[in-house]
Amino acid sequence: PMERLLKEAQDLAEQGVKELILVAQETTVYGIDLYKKKMLPELLHRLCAIPGIVWIRLLYCYPEEITPELVQVMKEEKKICHYLDMPIQHSSDRILKKMGRRTNRKELLDKIEMLRTEIPDIVLRTTLITGFPGETQEDFEEMLSFVDMVGFERLGVFPYSPEEGTPA
């Protein structure tokens, strides 16, 4: 629950902790299970109000869940690092669909453009999966072209490996 997270953050701040890193499998959907709606923007506002916390970093924000409201909070709250770990996994529409992702190349480009327009100094990190079953040389080249065009500041690339319960 949010109150427990806020209490833990307050306790950490009182112990001298300066940075909070919010990380979950899908950080951007925080609150859906408990409150039946996304609560990350509210949580961020409330964490930023805690004295002693200097900066907050967000990890694992899937692009399809990054909302204009979240971007606005990141823009307004000075304690939130202009750094976003946004795992896109691939950029080929065909492979994204096979992976079960809920986005496509155009939506990825639109989201990145929105982030860079609203937060010009944002640092974007992403992770990619290569060798996904059925990936062709054309899919791979498309991904290389996408990465070159976007110019991510940080990039992690991993070979496909089967993981129970997920296609990717």
Segment roles from a protein language model:
Residues 13-140:
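Conserved SAM/AdoMet-binding glycine-rich loop
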Residues 146-168:
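Conserved glycine-bearing catalytic or ligand-binding loops at nucleotide- and phosphate-handling centers
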Residues 1-3:
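Canonical Radical SAM [4Fe-4S] cluster-binding loop centered on the CxxxCxxC motif
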Residues 9, 43-44, 155:
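Metal-dependent enolase-superfamily TIM-barrel catalytic cores that perform enediolate-based chemistry
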Residues 6-7, 23, 148, 156:
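Short, surface-exposed helix/turn micro-motifs that flank interaction/cofactor sites
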Residues 12-13, 147:
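Hydrophobic pocket-lining residues that define ligand/cofactor binding sites across diverse proteins
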